[in-house]
UniProtKB/Swiss-Prot annotation:
Biased composition range(s): Basic residues: 14-31
Organism: Drosophila grimshawi (Hawaiian fruit fly)
InterPro entries reported in the protein's UniProt record: JmjC_dom, NO66-like, RIOX1/NO66-like_C_WH
Required co-factors: Fe(2+)
Source organism, top-level taxon: Eukaryota
Presence of keyword Ribonucleoprotein: no
Protein name from the UniProt record: Bifunctional lysine-specific demethylase and histidyl-hydroxylase NO66
Length: 723
């Protein structure tokens, strides 16, 4: 049976599964689903409804209402209000009811941490071979006949849009973009295989050889099993994960565990019926962290220590990604190994990547998954609209790219070696369970790391500060530089999302952008900076003269230091220019905005053109001097001064869904028009009439506003009347 036939047979077998009977409890849980991603496209009225429900919930708590029935009624009301926020225009990958588990299996899959680890990790030496079955989230396929399957624009843009392919050279082993790529935006170079060990003993291994169709390995063919990069389940050898110590009794110091006692309110600032895009991002972040308030999070945990938020809503993130969504994504889209998907393993202290060449077809991906490999999706927001909406909303609040990776791990497996990253990480546990261990940074210099580490060895790790299991609906935050590793339990798979923010967003990055300009300006305008070095400098300064105490050496050092303090203190305008350079990077990296249906009809994206009886094009919009407009998003543009007194308006509305696929978009504008841009930026989120723009005449106001609107940068207060 060829590869596609095998997969069709596998799909027919899977769809033939008898749907599980839904219980009353499951129906209640379906009604309680909180669709986080819908907040990214919610209208002010819908968010206001949530505020009212949350306010009622808080008031009931203040009045001492502690009865389970009353508390549950209030909680259901608030949750249902959030669920109603889903935008009707959003394409949703909803899971089919045939994949629902019965109530007994669901209760079993979420048993307590203590019970699971008391029996499974008592030896502290190894994890036993897992059993491939449906409740544990494993997938089995067979290509042999007779074998059974287990279901498992007037302003003209002057920039060119040259496609740039993503290469593995942009990333490290842990899929973090290198600082050079983030800051310089150079053309990526292909990554060399088989990198040398780092100074810390980390390993960056080359991809292991793998057959193009792993289904052959599952058919029982001895030759195929022998050539497999990973042990097949047909072999007698038991799979072992890298040994981990026995689970700790409780979380260690410096890590907070917030349990489900809702106290934070999901709030959105409304101004004349207009929702601020930054406040919308704050609203989404608040929903992700609830019941932990944003004030507590940023004052107690942000960039300082880890925090776990435990919840009982297991389907909280189910609208963002699921096992079934991934399977459909592989079928409907052309995803390639290394570019879009990695299959990885970590066994016996060795981290390996098992990527074949070419397209990631479902049989190949699920074959590796069934052999114990983790599946990492590198750009899921390109294909999953709900997840893309969350990232697009959060990037407005954080003023930087919000990335997302999806990790699917089979039972009793670990896909990655211990390491730390250069991003602030939010782990959203979507399905199953996963045991996470966090460790302090290896050294003070690794705290808030600016680059990710290599793969660390178990012997290099200190005592863990956190050792807990994330269940579906839980969230874990940890700062950059925090060492972490995660492993699944013997009877449970894991599906989680990692949201990454604040990569290369520190004062160090500001200084790197600032100091070259400050130095060049000081050299240009100060004679002392251009004077020649004194004769004999080589005889008093340098490594070989470091232990001398001569007057000449002391004078040279003192004078050099005085030049720094006198001429290299940056001015306010120089700091502004450096921040603009960081903002240009954001405009290049940002996801395009997610346009809600209520917004689309007030933007160029909802405009439709027709031809008249003579064949002439007729537009369905007509901006007048009374039309009220504002920017589509608060951070959607950045006005930057260039050399020779030219001005550029950078924008991200035309960005591709792939990371930096094109060069940054910008248009050059006149200084007179810059005043109108400044007004639109400073007045956001208020709408202003076109005639109020600070331009010489009404015609100029209309031309400028029309050009910006046709570029997709503006939204009108009211839809246009259709003729």
């Amino acid at each position: 049976m060829d590869e596609m036939s095998a997969y069709v047979a596998y799909g027919m077998k899977k769809t033939a599964k008898k749907p599980a009977k839904k219980t009353t409890k499951q129906n209640r849980q379906k009604q309680k689903a909180a669709n986080i991603y819908s907040l990214a496209t919610s209208t002010p009225a819908k968010i206001s409804a949530v505020k009212q429900n949350n306010g009622a919930k808080g008031k009931a708590k203040a009045n001492g209402v502690k009865g389970n029935a009353k508390a549950q009624t209030t909680k259901d009301s608030a949750t249902n209000s959030v669920a109603k926020m889903a935008d009707e225009s959003v394409d949703d990958y909803s899971s089919d009811s045939s994949y629902d588990e019965d109530e007994d299996n669901e209760e079993l899959s979420h048993s307590s941490n203590e019970d699971d680890y008391g029996s499974e990790l008592s030896s502290g030496e190894e994890f036993e071979e897992y059993t491939l079955n449906s409740p544990s989230g494993s997938c089995s396929c067979s290509a042999s006949s007779g074998s059974s399957n287990t279901e498992n624009s007037p302003p003209a843009a002057t920039s060119s849009r040259t496609p740039k392919k993503r290469s593995t050279g942009d990333m490290d082993d842990n899929n973090n973009k290198s600082p050079a790529v983030k800051q310089q935006k150079l053309q990526p170079q292909e990554q060399k295989e088989g990198k040398e060990l780092s100074k810390k003993g980390s390993r960056k291994s080359a991809p292991a050889a793998a057959p193009s169709c792993p289904l052959l390995r599952l058919s029982g063919n001895a030759a195929a099993i022998k050539s497999s990069a990973m042990p097949s389940k047909a072999t007698a050898e038991k799979r072992k994960s890298c040994p981990l110590p026995k689970k700790m009794a409780a979380a260690g110091k410096g890590v907070a565990v917030v349990k489900q006692e809702p106290k934070a309110k999901v709030e959105s600032v409304q101004n004349g019926g207009v929702e601020d895009s930054v406040e919308r991002g704050i609203c989404v972040l608040g929903a992700l962290l609830d019941p932990l308030s944003l004030d507590d999070f940023f004052s107690r945990y942000w960039e300082s220590k880890a925090c776990q938020v435990k919840r009982k809503r297991k389907d909280l993130y189910s609208d963002l990604v699921s096992f079934e969504m991934i399977d459909e994504m592989l079928i409907e889209n052309h995803l390639e190994f290394t570019t879009n998907i990695d299959v990885t393993s970590y066994k016996d202290g060795v981290r390996q990547t098992h990527n074949p060449d070419g397209r990631a077809m479902p049989p190949t991906v699920w074959g590796h998954y069934s052999d114990g490999c983790s599946v990492r999706i590198l750009n899921p927001s390109t294909y999953l609209k709900g997840l893309r909406g969350v990232c697009a909303a959060l990037q407005e609040h954080f003023h930087c790219l919000v990335g997302a990776n999806v990790y699917l791990t089979p039972p009793n497996s670990q896909g990655f070696a211990p390491h730390y990253d250069d991003i602030e990480a939010f782990v959203l546990q979507v399905e199953g369970r996963k045991r996470w261990r966090l460790y302090d940074a290896p050294s003070p210099n690794d705290v808030l790391a600016r680059t990710s580490s290599g793969n660390l060895k178990q012997q290099q790790l200190s005592k863990p500060i956190f050792d807990e299991v994330l269940e579906a609906g839980d969230l874990l935050y940890f700062p950059r530089g925090c060492v972490h590793q995660a492993v699944t339990e013997q009877q449970h798979h894991s599906l989680h999302i990692t949201l990454s923010v604040y990569q290369q967003q520190s004062y160090a990055n500001l200084m790197e952008a600032l100091m070259p300009a400050v130095l060049q300006n000081a050299i240009k305008h100060n004679l002392d900076m251009r004077r020649g070095l004194p004769l004999g400098t080589w005889h008093h300064l340098g490594m070989v003269h470091g232990d001398k105490k001569t007057k000449e050496r002391s004078d040279l050092i003192t004078h050099t230091q005085s030049l720094f303090s006198k001429y290299l203190a940056p001015t306010a305008s120089q700091i502004d220019a450096a921040v603009d350079q960081l903002a240009i990077r954001f405009q290049h990296e940002a996801l395009p905005p997610r346009i809600a249906s209520s917004e689309k009809k007030r933007t160029v994206f909802g405009s439709r053109n027709k031809k008249d009886k003579h064949g002439n094009c007729r537009c369905d919009y007509d901006l007048t001097e009374q039309t009220k407009i504002r920017l589509l998003r608060q951070n959607i543009v950045r006005l930057v001064a260039q050399e020779e007194n030219s001005l550029r308006l950078y924008y991200y509305v035309d960005n591709a869904l792939e990371y930096c696929k094109y060069e940054a978009n910008f248009m050059e504008i006149d200084r007179v028009e810059a005043n109108a841009i400044k007004m639109l930026i400073n007045s956001y989120p208020k709408y202003v009439s076109i005639s109020s723009l600070p331009l010489p005449n009404v015609e100029h106001c209309l031309d400028t506003a029309t050009g910006l609107w046709e570029r997709g940068l503006l939204i009108t207060e009211e839809p246009f009347k259709k003729n």
